[in-house]
Amino acid sequence: MDAKDLYDLILSTYPSVTEGAICDLHKPCSKHRECSIKLSNKYIDFDAVETEFDRGRVSRPSVDAVKNAGQYFCFIEIKGWKKYLEWNTPSEKGIQEQAEYDLKGKLETSEEICVAISGQHNIFRQIPEVFILVTDIDVSEQGVENFHFNMMALATTSSVWESKCNTELNSQLEQQITTIPKYYVTCKQLENKLNVISRV
């Protein structure tokens, strides 16, 4: 079994679960598109897979989406910051709290579900995995080393807060996902990243 076989098996096991663009799986974007970028790739809504898999049991946090890319099986988690920054008065503490995602737990639950669906306990010894954390803000902003200086100089600019959001979330990614390759990208960069991964 390869990554595409696993992807297709998930779809055939749960025919009520559909594929969609990454924008459709991000709740703020699914209701009102914030950008004009048209992304063509389709992803399995893995939250819907978890709901079906755990029906009648306590629901567990899982990744938002999965996708095959060449030999790799990609677990994808979406974390939007734009609406949070628009609707709230940003603070260091607030951003730290928002960034405290159980990424490791989401990955482990999702792996367990894939193992059960495949019927192969060692499926991820056969299929290499990748974890991709996707956000809706620019990930090229400067890190926390410039945060305090920027706060004094540019206290009202959103890019300063985006920098803090990126630093906190990337820190969570680095600390929690330690056994497989991981990437932190914007939604606009996702398809290009998948193309790169598929050529490895």
Predicted regions and their residues:
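Conserved catalytic cores of phosphodiester-cleaving nucleases, focusing on short active-site segments
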Residues: A65-K67, Y72-G80, S110
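Catalytic micro-motifs at enzyme active sites that drive phosphoryl/nucleotidyl and oxygen chemistry
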Residues: F53-R55, V63-D64, S118-N122
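Basic, amphipathic N-terminal segments that precede the first structured/catalytic domain
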Residues: M1-R60, K193-V200
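Catalytic cores of nucleic-acid endonucleases
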Residues: W81-D138
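Short, low-complexity, polybasic intrinsically disordered segments
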Residues: R125, E129-V196
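Short, flexible loop/turn elements at secondary-structure junctions
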Residues: C29, N41-Y43, E50, A69, ...
